[in-house]
């Protein structure tokens, strides 16, 4: 006989679970504050050599977070967020922000490098496990790149794309701009890392992309200026990183991956493949944002960045495919599969970040 007894959830167990989660979040927040304090210490490496205990609590939390994010099947969202925020705070020292020069006092710290390497080693293994690298190595690279670019130029609308086009409110649009400002206000910065060295057609094409991103040297035409104008139209913060706390870890991960592949010249093919996807697929995403702005009857200034990007990135996508990655595939036939790896990883991370942004917008609305 079936029992009619109703089993209610164990309130005490649920309470304990919530308290554990809150303690973990608080632990990550405290560790990030400790890390910021370490960043500001003059001569950090020598100070920690003299007093190792000073960084021990942060280091314990860092180790715990790496295990929680990458060490089991059930990834911990808060651990991911903590790690990507720490990694970004280290990586951002590679750029100059026109702020207090003392902020760069530890830019070459071996301790910071050690923290970065600990995170990157575990994180990159976790990311690579999501790609069938062996399968990529068997493909006709040039054919696969052309096929991918053709498919990603005008992809079918996803559920998230339809939501942005048809349902997102003005409040949601402002939230989109807030998150988007994380990249939009410093656009193209990391591309600079791969432009030095021997002159050739590939290098010159990349320089052309950068020059257009930077408005041909005119601040009024720089892409980030158009993004700032969109923010200003709503009375929003136009300072870089002004909405850093809103940025999902998935977006931070894409930026940190970009720092990694531009910083290491051995990953030049991966970066080139990634940039090709970014330039090819960008216009489709921007058309969604533009459609939303037009539906909401926003001003030209509130959507001008999207219109500019659609025009220019369609051209940049063709340049990247024809003059960069196909050329590199011929120049490095044994390693050309890395172009596909970079392309596919950028797509995977980009899709993951886009989904996270839409979830954040829905929550904000």
Predicted regions and their residues:
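Non-heme di-metal
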Residues: 2-365
